[in-house]
Amino acid sequence: MERAAERLARQRARGLWRSRFACCVAAEPSGSRLGQSVRGAAAAPARCAAEGSADLYLAVNNEGPEVAPPARTGPPDADGIEGGAAVAGNEQGGVAAGNERRAATGDEKESASGGENESESESESESESESGADDGDWDDDDDAGPAGGVTREEAEGAARALNFRIIRRLTPGSEGRVFEATGPAPAQEHVVLKIGASASTLAEAMLLRTLDHANVVKLKAVLFHGELVCAVLARYREDLHTHLWKIDRPMALPTALQVTRAVLQGLAYLHSRRIAHRDVKTENVFLNGPGDVCLGDFGAAHGPVTEPRYYGLAGTLETNSPELLARARYDCRTDVWSAGVVAYEMLAYPRALFDSPAGPQGEDAEASGPPTILGDRDCARQLLRVIRRLAVHAEEFPPSPTDRLTRNFKRHAATGREPHSPYRCLAVLRLPCDADRLLHQMLTFDFRARPTAAELLEHPVFGAASG
């Protein structure tokens, strides 16, 4: 706790708005057919945001992509949660420079992308110039180079050519550039632009075109400028991580349950369509208010997920499920675990349930320099942290001796806790019985015993919260 408080104080002293947890995994699938499909539409390089993106793209776009779909109205502003804009759908599935929450990846080729800087106030942003707004703490020298095959100047030129006025630059990722902008006259609507020469940018946009749910970010349009893909997304007041940073305290239980239910509703919708998000975290939960919540950033999404098997490594180290960290078989319930970590963070802020593995200079080392892609050993260290933090009993591991999670990690099981008993580390939250039970169910170690998102929505705690 003392180290976490000191780290938070240092971040605030430096004026950092960048998320601690914006890094995630991206692995390029072998034998991907995505590049060929996308080159025909936009002549973009064949790179995938996360392993499995090619299958997902082809599954939902068998007849090829359509461009510039009709604009869809984003959610209205709502009272209750204040703040600046948030990127609804910034690329994850990669590594953002300079952040503390780090990524894991395996032997596959990495295709890194990054999260956004947290937004500043609207009054500050509107005073910025068209060609380049304040970058916050982002280094202009680092920002000038290519990201996702496109330089800052190229991306800004494309935005202007498409009649968008840039308000603010957000942290670029290796899949492309991200901006807050106003759209063409007469509406001049505030939106978020994702501009890149990456096939995964188009694949994510084409996936979002097929989704229509109140708790899933809305795509407004997909535009092209030469070889560049421009996804136009809804703009939200803030993301959940920023909101927690600003209030600097745990959320009230009713509000946390309201947000948790919205996240589970979005996941239940995705899972009914056999899509796993694979990167649920506070940075990817966007809010206009506690009753207006959506999931964004589908750069790591995979589908169709039809049965438990290994679909590749993706996501964020601290929020990844045990089965994904072990590179074992998994299904859509991997998202339920991640949603449980998000729920804990809302209720325990600024405490984190699972800190990232210690870096070369120790846990307190400030993140600096270029991003780091983490490998199997980092995933293993993180999984050991999960096992030790929850004191997972041997009987709570998957029963099959051939399961990678059981085969490689059961020997590290704890002995000081009864199997299937409450996690001691959750007792400090002092939750009511129903809420405590919900959190324990979401954090069930063996995903085969973990409820689905749809099943959790029937939990009595949500009836009590809405009553």
From Swiss-Prot:
Composition skew (Basic and acidic residues), residue ranges: 99-111
Compositionally biased region (Acidic residues): 117-144
PROSITE patterns per UniProt: PROTEIN_KINASE_DOM, PROTEIN_KINASE_ST
Residues at which ATP binds: 170-178, 194
Protein localization: Host cytoplasm; Host nucleus
Catalytic activities: L-seryl-[protein] + ATP = O-phospho-L-seryl-[protein] + ADP + H(+); L-threonyl-[protein] + ATP = O-phospho-L-threonyl-[protein] + ADP + H(+)
Active-site residues per Swiss-Prot or TrEMBL entry: 279 (proton acceptor)
Annotated segments matching region Disordered: 64-155
Keyword Aminoacyl-tRNA synthetase (UniProt): no
Location (main, coarse): host cell
Modification(s) after translation: Phosphorylated by UL13 homolog; this phosphorylation regulates subsequent phosphorylation of UL31 and UL34 homologs by US3. Autophosphorylated.
All copies of domain Protein kinase, residue ranges: 164-462
Entries under SMART domains matching the protein: S_TKc
One term of GO molecular function: ATP binding
EC number, UniProt record: 2.7.11.1
A GO BP annotation: symbiont-mediated perturbation of host chromatin organization
InterPro entries: Kinase-like_dom_sf, Prot_kinase_dom, Ser/Thr_kinase_AS, Ser_Thr_kinase
Record has Ribosomal protein as a keyword: no
Keywords assigned by UniProt, alphabetized: ATP-binding, Host cytoplasm, Host nucleus, Host-virus interaction, Kinase, Modulation of host cell apoptosis by virus, Modulation of host chromatin by virus, Nucleotide-binding, Serine/threonine-protein kinase, Transferase
Highest taxon of the lineage: Viruses
Family: Belongs to the protein kinase superfamily. Ser/Thr protein kinase family.
Its biological purpose: Multifunctional serine/threonine kinase that plays a role in several processes including egress of virus particles from the nucleus, modulation of the actin cytoskeleton and inhibition of apoptosis. Phosphorylates UL31 and UL34 homologs, two critical regulators of capsid budding from nucleus to endoplasmic reticulum, thereby facilitating virion egress. Modulates and redistributes host components of the nuclear envelope, including LMNA, emerin/EMD and the nuclear matrix protein MATR3. Phosphorylates envelope glycoprotein B (gB), probably to direct it to the cell surface.
Protein name: Serine/threonine-protein kinase US3 homolog
